[in-house]
Structure formats: C-alpha cells, structure tokens
Swiss-Prot record:
One of its GO terms (biological process) is urea catabolic process. GO terms for cellular component: cytoplasm. Gene3D superfamilies: P-loop containing nucleotide triphosphate hydrolases. Its main location: cytoplasm. Facilitates the functional incorporation of the urease nickel metallocenter. This process requires GTP hydrolysis, probably effectuated by UreG. Disrupting the ure2 operon has no effect on urease activity, or pathogen survival in BALB/c mice when inoculated by gavage, but confers slightly enhanced resistance to low pH killing in vitro. Disulfide bonds: none annotated. This is Urease accessory protein UreG 2. Keywords: Chaperone, Cytoplasm, GTP-binding, Nickel insertion, Nucleotide-binding. GTP binds at G11, P12, V13, G14, S15, G16, K17, M18. It is found in: Cytoplasm. It holds the Pfam family cobW.
Length: 212
C-alpha cells in the first residue's frame, strides 16, 4: 500500500481550522486530488458534520469522519494519538486511492503539536481577531509548524490589529519557514496555501511550471 501523506491542521478554538480545510479541499479536488478529512471534537462529531454539509457535492460524506476524543485536544493528536491513528488507517484502507489526508485537531493553544507518528506535515492556524501579538508570543505552533496560516485578515480593522506587525513578527519567529495570510470569506490567500501544499506535501511537478 502506498504511503499517503497526512497534514495536521491545528490551532486555537475559533481560529478557522475547519474553514481553511473547507476552502482548500474544493481546489485540490478540482486539480484531481482525492482527499480524506478527519476532524476531532471532545464529545461530538459536529465539525465532521459541518464539513459534510459545506462540501456536499464536492467530497462524498464517506470521505469525512469525526473522532470523539473525550478529552484534551492535544492528547488525542500528540501524547496518545491511537484513536486518530485507527481512524486514519481505517479510512486509508477503505479509500486506498487517496492522495492526501487532512486531519483537524480540536481547538487548543500555542503549545499544540502533532505526533510524528500521526502526521507528516503541520499547518498551524491563528486568527487576526486574537490580536497582532500572537506571532511574537511564539510557541511550537508559531515557530515549528511547516506552514503558519494567519486567518481572518478582514477583522484587522475591527480589533485594531496590524497585519504588518504580524508579518514582521512571523518572519522573525519563523525564519525561512512559510506563512500566509488568509480570508476564507473571499478566498484571499487560499490559492497561495494550496500552492504550498502542492509544492511541499504532494510534490506536484506542475507547481514549478506554473510559477515560471
């Protein structure tokens, strides 16, 4: 069986992890990729149901599953990812033609990371509404994630946040690691995020041709 790449999508409650997934999946599917989505909630599978409703007609419901973790969000994706590993392996066996798995963690804090046994690539999502000081607060999600997504750029003027400050601090904390500003309502930045996924996770040779 081929090794299917897995992306972990983490971040604080309400940062827009699910919205990011719902934005990138249709684009990836249009490009010909076959996707699985796995979500985490503590006592429900509400996120999975939301994704199923939003992506109805785009991604079949059977390719979207929710995991009820019953406890701390980071435990289920880091210290003891057994429930998620079982879900991923079951879905991959059911859909062996899959090209990419997107696994959303439950909402957590700046210390969130994923077990390397569970994922191959880490996207961390923060939102502008939480304030422009978030990048400089650092934490594993800010500095160690493979891609940092700064979501909800449209809210900056309403909360007095400076996107330039967030840009400067992200560069300082992340060095050469990529980050992208997004607005899921207008799809601002989503194409850039998909480009990074294709280039760094799916190793799509067409990306370099498109950039030329």
């Amino acid at each position: 069986m081929k090794k299917i790449p897995r992306i972990g999508v983490g971040g604080p409650v309400g940062s827009g992890k699910m919205a990011i997934i719902e934005a990138v999946v249709p684009i990836l599917i249009k490009l010909g990729y076959r996707i699985l989505v796995i979500t985490n909630d503590i006592v429900t599978t509400e996120d999975a149901k939301h994704v199923q409703r939003t992506l109805k007609g785009v991604l079949i419901e059977d390719r979207i599953v929710g995991v009820e973790t019953g406890g701390c969000p980071h435990t289920a994706v880091r210290e003891d990812p057994s429930m998620n590993l079982a879900a991923v392996e079951e879905m991959e066996a059911k859909f062996p033609d899959t090209d990419l798995v997107l696994l959303e963690s439950g909402g957590d804090n700046l210390t969130l990371t994923f077990s390397p046994a569970l994922i191959d690539f880490f996207i961390y999502v923060i939102d502008v509404a939480a304030g422009d000081k978030i990048p400089c607060k650092n934490g594993p999600g800010i500095s160690q994630s493979d891609i940092l997504v700064i979501n909800k750029t449209d809210l900056a003027p309403y909360v007095g946040a400076s996107l330039q400050v967030m840009d400067d601090d992200s560069r300082m904390m992340r060095g050469k690691k990529p980050f992208v500003f997004t607005n899921c309502k207008t799809n601002e930045g989503i194409d850039d995020l998909v480009h990074l996924i294709r280039e760094n996770v799916l190793f799509d040779t067409e990306v370099s041709k498109e950039s030329a």
